[in-house]
Every structure is written in structure tokens, then in C-alpha cells.
A protein has these predicted regions:
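Glycine-rich phosphate-binding loops of nucleotide-dependent enzymes
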Residues: 2-232
């Protein structure tokens, strides 16, 4: 890659009317590592992730992807570059199928036509879910799934982009213990593939179980970054 870090923020500042949400945040994310972001509510974690995923633009500062200064005008630009995000607030299309949710906006077309290739979409979704060991029917309507299963579909969707950076914002909030273990298995595999995982959680046991690096934010300011092994 020619650069030690796949993603960096330099002196990121984000100001909303009457509120400084982020003030001079500089972070570096390594490929093949899980980087946890810690901080109380209001620390600025979600705001920073929305900047990295193209939902917000920073007031000041820059984002670098593979050493190149980058600016996102909308989320699809960050996805195309190689950054995908699993949001804490799920936003599925409830009356569409699992496969339609996974490939929403990038549906495969029958060659030479404007028509969606439903068979390919179903087969690709099944292959993706099987690869992640998720027992979910690609054809089932999203509204018929449990919240936990919807969360796993969102995780599968993020993986389907084959992104270099995967942001997970409180991904276990609706998962059972066994589902958390399954998610951690997926995370470790992504890590082995050289992906950078940014992991946001309030659960200390999860952070120490899965993370390599831990950064702490407080009141929109950077406190420090530490090896997880030293904090545990």
C-alpha cells in the first residue's frame, strides 16, 4: 500500500450552531487492525464517523485515505472509495427482501437490458450469507426478521462492498451473546484480510476482547490512543 495507515484524520473540527462537536481530532487507522473508539455520549464519536462516511463535511481539517487527502460530498463517495459503515440506527427497507436490501442502488442487471437480474441477486446474496455463516433466506421480507437478524443483514451488506475500512457503530446493541460471538468471528476474518475495522462501543468487555488499538474522545477532544493490551 505504501502507507502505514489506510485512513487518517488531521485536526478535524466540526461546528454546529452553538456547539463545537469536534475540536482538533487527529487519528490514524491501521489496515488489519480493530481500532475501538471510546467516549461518553456527546464525546463526538458518531459525528466523527459521519464525517468519515460522507454524511457530514468537517468545518476544518482533512481526511486522508491511503495517504491522499480526500473529501466526501455524500455517503456513496466514501463507499466507492472503500469505506463502509454499519449504523447504530437500522434503516432497512422493510417491505423489500433481504437481497433487495443488500444490493439496493447497485442491483445487477440482465446483460444488455435495463432489467434487474433477480436470479443473480439471489445467488450472490446466498453466497454472501453462506460465506458469513448466516442462516437467512435472501428472499424473505426484511420486516419478517428479528432486529438482530436485520443487524446481521446490515453487516453482510457492509462486507459486500469489499471495503478497506469498515465502521461499526454499536453493532452489538441488539445481538445475543452467541450472535456477538459470531460477529467477532466475522470481524477477525476481516482483520485477517487486511481490513481496518473502526469499532464503537460502550461495552468495555467487547472492546478489550476484539480491539488492537483504543482511542478515547472526551467532549469533542482527543484524549489519546493506546494498545488495547495495555489497558486490559
Amino acid at each position: 500500500m505504501g502507507n502505514e495507515y489506510v485512513l487518517e484524520t488531521r485536526d478535524i473540527r466540526k461546528v454546529f450552531p452553538g456547539v463545537v462537536a469536534l475540536d482538533g481530532i487527529s487519528l490514524k487507522f491501521r489496515p488489519g487492525a480493530v481500532h475501538a473508539l471510546m467516549g461518553e455520549n456527546g464525546a463526538g464519536k458518531s459525528t466523527l464517523m459521519k464525517i468519515l462516511s460522507g454524511m457530514y463535511k468537517p468545518t476544518e481539517g482533512v481526511v486522508l485515505y491511503k495517504g491522499v487527502e480526500t473529501e466526501f460530498n455524500e455517503p456513496i463517495e466514501s463507499i466507492r472509495l472503500g469505506i463502509s459503515m454499519i449504523h447504530q440506527e437500522l434503516s432497512p427497507v422493510p417491505h423489500r427482501s433481504v437481497m433487495e436490501n443488500v444490493w439496493l442502488g447497485r442491483e445487477p442487471l440482465i446483460k444488455g437490458t435495463p432489467f434487474v437480474d433477480h436470479r443473480k441477486m439471489r445467488d450472490d446474496t446466498k453466497a454472501l450469507l453462506d460465506d458469513l455463516e448466516l442462516a437467512i433466506d435472501p428472499r424473505i421480507e426484511m420486516s419478517k426478521l428479528t432486529v438482530a437478524k436485520m443487524q446481521m443483514v446490515e453487516i453482510a451488506k457492509a462486507v459486500s462492498y469489499n471495503s478497506e475500512v469498515v465502521i461499526m457503530d454499536e453493532p452489538t446493541s441488539s445481538l445475543t451473546r452467541s450472535e456477538v460471538d459470531h460477529l467477532f468471528k466475522i470481524i477477525r476474518r476481516l482483520k485477517d484480510q487486511g481490513k481496518a475495522i473502526i469499532y464503537i462501543s460502550h461495552k468495555m468487555d467487547e472492546i478489550f476482547s476484539i480491539s488492537d488499538d483504543v482511542s478515547v474522545l472526551r467532549d469533542g477532544k482527543y484524549v489519546g490512543t493506546y494498545p488495547a493490551a495495555e489497558l486490559n
